[in-house]
């Protein structure tokens, strides 16, 4: 029997790895932004699996933890149809303030970019405004931070390291007014790329006078296409193991003077936290993949045999 060539082996491995990524995408939980904080205040996000009756939030409603896998979908703006919630709130934030968004779980996808956009509403409030009608500009991005496309450190990996949170500073030059802020993570571990956007309603005060240029503005849908290089990259090819460049999808960063697809990244800091001791591995009733510990966790810590409670980060331990 003739042995396969090296090229054939590499191709088979790439195909197998991609298949594993596709399988993992189906069995792993996904999620979205479930809260925001700045200046010491917590703003509760939308809870997509709770009844909408009585929910009040600065975040626009969204219905599912599932990813958006069509970059031109009508929901790609804010993971919804663009409409506000029944009891929509607005939060006030000063230009120059750092806003932190928090995801619902230990994020399972460390390979992909993080982006943050602002979209200015036409009046004094975003109440009643459909977000699909807005023009958006990007104020933050972090793509491939170091290493290679196939084995490097990505913005989403840094988000995970920051306790599943991402902090973006509102530029001090942004004009005051009513805005939507859009936090987004894109997962590249399988194709099509998985897009996870959520939006919240703001009033920005104390701003500047630098409006975004026309080249910095995009619509959603419309800002991405399914053929964008930043959405079609294959992490499992031989080239990906040596390639050190990645083009973040979307327009150029606000104020950068670029032409879009910039690899520019923004430094981010992590808020110090108090760590909790590792949970015990006493046999119990928590099933595989269940939570068994973490800061603020008041449930059980014992996993069913043969699984053990493993620390994922300070806020989350899991039966594995």
Curated annotation (Swiss-Prot):
State which residues carry a glycan (glycosylated): 163
Q: How is the cofactor bound?
A: Binds 1 copper ion per subunit.
What cofactor does this protein call for? Cu(2+)
Q: Superkingdom of this entry's organism?
A: Eukaryota
What does the induction field say? Answer: Expression is induced in the presence of cellulose, but not fructose or malt.
- Enumerate the Gene Ontology biological process terms: cellulose catabolic process
The positions annotated for binding O2 are: 189, 194
Residue ranges of the region described as Disordered: 255-284
Domain characteristics, as noted in the entry: Has a modular structure: an endo-beta-1,4-glucanase catalytic module at the N-terminus, a linker rich in serines and threonines, and a C-terminal carbohydrate-binding module (CBM). The CBM domain is essential for binding to and subsequent oxidative degradation of polysaccharide substrate.
Name of the protein: AA9 family lytic polysaccharide monooxygenase-like protein CEL1
Cite the source lineage: Eukaryota, Fungi, Dikarya, Basidiomycota, Agaricomycotina
Q: Which gene encodes it?
A: CEL1
């Amino acid at each position: 029997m003739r042995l396969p060539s090296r090229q054939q082996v590499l191709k088979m491995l790439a195909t197998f790895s991609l298949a594993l990524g596709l399988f993992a995408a189906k069995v792993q939980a996904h999620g979205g932004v479930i809260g925001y904080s700045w200046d010491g205040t917590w703003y509760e996000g939308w809870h997509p699996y709770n009844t909408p009756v009585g929910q009040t939030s600065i975040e626009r409603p969204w219905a599912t933890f599932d990813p958006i896998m069509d970059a031109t979908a009508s929901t790609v703006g804010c993971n919804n149809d663009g409409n506000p919630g029944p009891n929509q709130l607005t939060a006030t934030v000063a230009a120059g303030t750092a806003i932190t968004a928090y995801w619902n779980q230990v994020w399972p996808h460390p390979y992909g970019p993080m982006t943050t956009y602002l979209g200015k509403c036409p009046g004094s409030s975003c109440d009643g405004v459909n977000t699909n009608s807005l023009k958006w500009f990007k104020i933050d991005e972090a793509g491939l931070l170091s290493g290679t496309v196939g084995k490097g450190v990505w913005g989403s990996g840094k988000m995970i390291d920051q306790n599943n949170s991402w902090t973006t500073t509102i530029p001090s030059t942004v004009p005051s007014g009513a805005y939507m802020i859009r936090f987004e993570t894109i997962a590249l571990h399988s194709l099509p790329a998985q897009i996870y956007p959520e939006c919240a309603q703001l009033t920005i005060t104390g701003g500047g006078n630098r409006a975004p240029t026309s080249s910095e503005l995009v619509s959603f849908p419309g800002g991405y296409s399914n053929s964008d290089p930043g959405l079609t990259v294959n992490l499992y090819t031989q080239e990906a193991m040596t390639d050190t460049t990645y083009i973040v999808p979307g327009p150029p960063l606000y104020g950068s003077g670029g032409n879009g697809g910039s690899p520019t990244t923004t430094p981010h800091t992590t808020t110090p936290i108090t760590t909790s001791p590792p949970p015990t591995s006493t046999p119990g009733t928590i099933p595989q993949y269940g939570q068994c510990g973490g800061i603020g966790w008041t449930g059980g810590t014992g996993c069913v045999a043969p699984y053990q409670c493993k620390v994922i980060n300070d806020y989350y331990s899991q039966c594995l």
